[in-house]
Amino acid sequence: MVDMKSILIVEDDRDLANLFKIVMEMVGFTVQMIHDGQQGLEALKDQCLPDVVMLDMHLPGVSGEDIYSMLRERGEDRRVLLCSADVQLVERYRALGANALTKPAPVDDLQRVVMQIASG
């Protein structure tokens, strides 16, 4: 039996979230989606993390940056892929050692980065 990897996509743009879901299912991930920051924070606060958390930096309610800070304090930031259309924000987080992609990203880049994160 194949060990399926899991991903939580926290993205307020529902069309983009659905596209990410399809792209991740194509490479064998089970996908959970959340569409606002507060729900994302609640889901990640008490649960065991999925293999990968794909986190939009600009969310309604609680920002992706705040959620990332919480995960970083818990030492769980290596499982996170930060996503933003803001190139400077992505570069800033990359310089700090975070996994970050500018969106929209090419499908193969997205799949490659997520697979690397899931592999540890």
Question: Where are the language model's segments positioned?
Answer:
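Active-site residues of response regulator receiver
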Residues: 56
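The feature encodes the CheY-like receiver
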Residues: 60
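Short amphipathic alpha-helix used as the core "switch/output" element in two-component signaling
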Residues: 65-77
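Two-component/phosphorelay signaling modules centered on CheY-like receiver
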Residues: 14-32
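Two-component His->Asp phosphorelay active-site signatures
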Residues: 13, 86
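A Lys-centered signature of the CheY-like receiver
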Residues: 103-104
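Acidic, metal-coordinating helix/loop segments flanking the phosphotransfer/catalytic sites
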Residues: 33-52
